[in-house]
């Protein structure tokens, strides 16, 4: 767990980076504390299409962002490095090894990393953040999100984390759920810490709840479990707009099973909060427009001009920055409301600029 992974890598080596890669360990990779980047999860291919190898992708994407072991930063590339590590240590392909050593022993017989037209049930078409259809696709890397599985398969996986089984011993399960990082950035809004492959939270009744979601182009999934009671829920959706929907389901599930609450339910309050912010921006825009109209014949617009210009350019700068990002957490969580937020913020900034730029029209009596 704590030995440098570079000691075991035979078929791939780290590209040049500003930080010491020889310090990266399996513990850090499993807990997203190795300083590695998120990775490009939009790099997708159709079944049967020629695609680069995981090693080629890793060579392009692995540029350490910070000193290994310093802080949490969710990283798909970290798990894809574990894929290479498993292949180099076992001499098998990652897909074959995981199927033999994990999937089949747990009874996940229909789960697979590869897919063709004969697979049943065939995965449904997904729908992205804009509501456009996304046909079934594959990633060059498997470990971070390349598994095709049914709700029944994932339920069996959830059960494996509740009691000793052919894959995990009791001690391994305890280690799996031991907090590795308590400062988890924006994820701290709904979770307390991160273990190995699971987000962790203490419920109000003192029980430990573990969870993890999955997101890709056109899909959104979530697994939540409470080992002490044997409860778990698996949610698989073919829409990338599903987080608010998932939050409502989890809130209802917790109430049904007698849990006080689960923290993912906070997304519901975030949804309401964004509605309030959008309403405030709309109201502010209307007020500025009304004031602009009412003072059209008055030369009194110099007051707070610098503040209005500054606020407008700050808003526009933020919007431009957001538009340049490949991935935004808020857009992922609130895909519909975020569009309204950007739109109302843009309108408000333009209205502020107009309130400064448009000249006041002198009254007729002033002309005389």
Kindly label every feature range from the protein language model.
Residues 2-17, 106:
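Short, glycine/proline-biased beta-turn/loop segments that scaffold the active-site neighborhood
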Residues 138-368:
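Catalytic loop of the DD-peptidase/beta-lactamase superfamily, centered on the K-T-G motif
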Residues 17-217:
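Short, surface-exposed loop or secondary-structure junction motifs
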Residues 5, 85-86, 234:
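Hydrophobic aliphatic residue packing
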Residues 2, 6, 95, 154, ...:
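Internal amphipathic alpha-helical segments of the cytochrome P450 catalytic fold
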Residues 4, 16, 42, 53, ...:
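Alpha-helix initiation/capping motif
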